[in-house]
């Protein structure tokens, strides 16, 4: 089961480095502030996360200078946790919120932080290589309505179909 989850992640992100024209990565990104556990509050649906609740992502520094990624979610249908372990590296330098992430071999996809609470790193708006990939991450299982509204507005302005957002159940 885990192997299928990893393969799906990789196939869908295979060779997808780039970002929507309307999306620009944050500058002055501070990796040490970004490390740790994040809760997925909202996302656009994809087969590799379909049906998952209680989704989290955890980021840690790797020995090679990259970032280890551990995505985890619960499948109610199967009554089990699914995990995907990956690695990420900066594309343009460590102060730019633009990374490439891989969950399978040499295949990488874009991970673009386009909005961020710069003071506390309490939330992040993240895009993939195109407007089909979008996430709202938070240090807490839920966010204030104002942050959610900002996420929806900024995402809509950048061409994401916010009517298709899935709000992740976190317990």
Swiss-Prot record:
It is found in: Cell outer membrane. The keyword Signal applies. Keywords: Cell outer membrane, Lipid-binding, Lipoprotein, Membrane, Palmitate, Signal. Residues 1-15 form the signal peptide. Pfam families: Lipocalin_2 (PF08212). Homodimer. Belongs to the calycin superfamily. Lipocalin family. This is Outer membrane lipoprotein Blc. It comes from Vibrio cholerae serotype O1 (strain ATCC 39315 / El Tor Inaba N16961). The lineage of its organism: Bacteria, Pseudomonadati, Pseudomonadota, Gammaproteobacteria, Vibrionales.
